[in-house]
């Protein structure tokens, strides 16, 4: 299971990252069980689920990213829910509520005056939705140039990066989607433009971002900070993708850890608020280049604005006063 929130301690700015940084360090620690027809694979910090149809997804506890620069971290367990409160030096609090199964339920920012902004409300369920977290939508009707729909960060200007982070959905959004529906439904994510960054050179089997590669995230960070300054309720998904070399489980774990590493670096080195980021790995499931061999194009980190998906397309409106919940 992901490490419980009770084990979290603050990390001072500038402190070196601890723990393993390569898959080889804990591959032998994986444990596989069967539960209700599903295969559950646990490894340090991650749970991988394979459903009866062979589809796999990965889940991790994102509260670990919030330790950086925290003044204090408090944990409360009420009714099976774990409530982690990260207190920053300026008195701002980031509150993360996790369900008994490790599912993120809510993420809230509380300012020094006690006013709250709900950033993620994953407890929402559409009354007409059927089944679990997977939503199957028809392909969106894309009316913008393809290179504005999937932007290559290496060729894009800072203005295009920022414009993409502010861009509306490419097609009509019929309803609000829960956070998990966004994470696990590619057809939902396809409603939003994205930015691909495939120039970070990770070592094989590692998710550590070398110092000489970190600067490649600067233009992304500047766009994120501009967008969050404009609307403090923005949420951006940092996606990790691999090529097809290696096992499915290794690729899923590696991509998830690389996405989390990129999100962490955006906060630690460039000051992007951790609460406005989420990370998720998809392994080799969504290649840009159809090949079973090594592919630099497929080994990439993708940044995608998901705010309109979470609130039903109202993200372009000015944020309501602090303490007002997003529309249902």
PLM feature spans:
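Envelope-exposed proteins and targeting segments
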Residues: 45, 80-82, 91-93, 114, ...
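Short, low-complexity, polar/charged sequence segments that are solvent-exposed and flexible
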Residues: 67-68, 103-105, 114-116, 126-127, ...
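A mature extracytoplasmic/lumenal domain signature
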Residues: 53, 62, 88-90, 99-101, ...
